[in-house]
Design a protein with these regions (language model features):
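Glycine-rich, phosphate-binding/catalytic loops in enzymes
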Residues: 29-30, 96, 113-115
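Active-site activation/catalytic loop segments of kinase-like enzymes and analogous catalytic loops
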Residues: 109-145, 158-175
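Start-of-helix signal in alpha-solenoid helical-repeat scaffolds, especially tetratricopeptide repeats
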Residues: 153-156
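Regulatory N- and C-terminal appendages and interdomain linkers associated
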Residues: 185-200
């Protein structure tokens, strides 16, 4: 099932998004480049929500992401929320893909990094035989015919997106649940800082 998930992600990235009328996804936020616009889209979310403390806390990683943005030689349709839980399965094959509100035009590595980090944040206790990250990356390359590049950068970018969406979502939870959820968020922030330190 997990490899079918990765292979479906590769198929999404092969869609002709221009022919499908999806060019409007290029205009989600202001910025000269594809990934920079996405960085700013999540940052704008913090501004709209009045999350000033969060902006102070993450301004360094945002500045680094903007300054080190790789070129995207093959812009693709990114699902955006490429989380295993957003994929429905029948007979071990993907039958539907849900939750497209975070879709954007960007680098395929952004989607795959988000998917792998999202899976590892859901659980560290997968059954025997579950493909490793390296096996899933190899499966993606085999399905897409593309070579993954700038993996450290896109891992930081994925964690930046995950952390900021969690911060924005925190206020939607009941107060008695927020403390437990905050602990989960702090764990993600620690992963973000570690990935950023390793990539610098």
């Amino acid at each position: 099932m997990i490899l079918a998930f990765v292979e479906t992600l590769a198929k999404i990235h092969q869609l002709d998004w221009r022919a499908q009328g999806l060019s409007f996804l290029l205009r989600r936020a202001v910025g000269p480049n594809l990934i920079g616009r996405e960085i700013n889209w999540y940052w704008d979310g913090l501004s709209w929500a009045g999350e000033i403390d969060a902006q102070k806390r993450f301004s360094g990683v945002r500045d680094w992401l903007l300054a080190n943005e790789p070129e995207v030689p093959r812009p693709v349709l990114c699902h955006g929320d490429a989380n295993f839980t957003n994929y429905l399965f029948k007979d071990n094959l993907v039958s539907a893909v849900l939750d497209w509100e975070m879709a954007f035009i960007g680098a395929p590595e952004a989607d795959l990094a988000y998917a792998l980090i999202g899976m590892s944040s859901l659980s560290s206790d997968y059954p025997p035989g579950t493909p490793s990250d390296d096996e899933m990356k190899a499966a993606y390359e085999a399905a897409s015919g593309a070579t993954l590049q700038h993996w450290e950068y896109y891992s930081v970018f994925a964690l930046y997106r995950i952390v900021l969406t969690h911060i924005l979502g925190l206020r939607a939870f009941p107060e008695d649940f927020q403390a437990a959820f905050q602990s989960h968020v702090e764990g993600l922030i620690a992963r973000l800082n570690a990935a950023w330190s390793a990539a610098k």
